[in-house]
Amino acid sequence: MLTVLAALSLLSLLTSATGRLAPDELCYAEPRRTGSPPNTQPERPPVIFEPPTIAIKAESKGCELILLDPPIDVSYRREDKVNASIAWFFDFGACRMPIAYREYYGCIGNAVPSPETCDAYSFTLIRTEGIVEFTIVNMSLLFQPGIYDSGNFIYSVLLDYHIFTGRVTLEVEKDTNYPCGMIHGLTAYGNINVDETMDNASPHPRAVGCFPEPIDNEAWGNVTFTELGIPDPNSFLDDEGDYPNISDCHSWESYTYPNTLRQATGPQTLLVGAVGLRILAQAWKFVGDETYDTIRAEAKNLETHVPSSAAESSLENQSTQEESNSPEVAHLRSVNSDDSTHTGGASNGIQDCDSQLKTVYACLALIGLGTCAMIGLIVYICVLRSKLSSLEFWRAQNVKHRNYQRLEYVA
């Protein structure tokens, strides 16, 4: 019984794993071409190799910029070079729509695949509709959710010959009383059925999330459509069939990717900036005397005087990254702004759970102690029963012997 209870407590800890927001260093809107650039087309299309084996929960609200991370433990692996790929999908139920895909080559075996830990990486296939809403940061999916992004995201990872799949159920708060335009998302097309609320009677900080620093209008003038994976608007004048079809989805057995994915040849840092550009260029909803500058100042003030646990997690991420190259830990996690146990995922793409691992190890120790105690108890009972049986047998033999002697004496 003790073992069962300990196992259940361990399972509850694992299934309640939480995560963090994207760190501040990913909230920018200027075009950056730092780091290693991609240099080849992907060798394979994005594929869901097997149905998801893990169910995870995630949350988002306001203008938060989030990272969905596949929690895969690579720390136990050898340093031998391996190839890897990461694919992200959105599950519409009848089909799975690919969102982003990237391949890595010659990666350090016990480090999270990234442009820094791999010899090379492919162009990124991303879903674009004139703007970049999603991109991959190492192995994580980066975006600013709208209220219509609530739903199931699926990750499919191939690490050497090992397959990892999971389902992240994202729940976006429907309160739209924030300055950013939250009326967008993957499920908004065709059937807008999510109730939005503007609850001014329940005041809360509006400057919650990512507010990139304003940039010059010509900053992106030298960036090509090809680098961002955005189709040239001029090409649509001749053939309207080139427009991406949002309903073009994957089945479990599909091995080809549809027109919803475009090949972005720019480096990872450029695509992160493109996501920030979409945030900066969206239709803002200011109230009263609010301006973008006042909102940014308020957001910084909130971070300074009322640090959220997500911000604390980001700081912990930076310190932990120097000690460890971001092992991803137990194959369970979610994004939740009030958790500070996941570290390292900001810069390395997948988070560890050092604090949570300590708790898990404690539970494992309890399971081990309980198992040993039960085994010892069983052995003790068996030995005791054996001794009692031997004693009873000896007594029976002794009585029999005395009776035999009495009969002999009578005779």
Swiss-Prot record:
Residues 306-327, 334-345 have a biased composition (Polar residues). One of its GO terms (cellular component) is virion membrane. Gene3D superfamilies: 2.70.230.10. It holds the Pfam family Herpes_glycop_D. Its main location: virion. It is a single-pass type I membrane protein. InterPro entries: Herpes_glycop_dom, Ig-like_dom_sf. Keywords: Glycoprotein, Membrane, Signal, Transmembrane, Transmembrane helix, Viral envelope protein, Virion. Residues 306-345 are annotated as: Disordered. It is found in: Virion membrane. It comes from the Viruses. The chain crosses the membrane at residues 364-384. Glycans are attached at N83, N138, N222, N245, N317. Residues 1-19 form the signal peptide. Belongs to the alphaherpesvirinae glycoprotein G family. Chemokine-binding protein that inhibits neutrophils' chemotaxis. This is Envelope glycoprotein G. It comes from Equine herpesvirus 1 (strain Kentucky A).
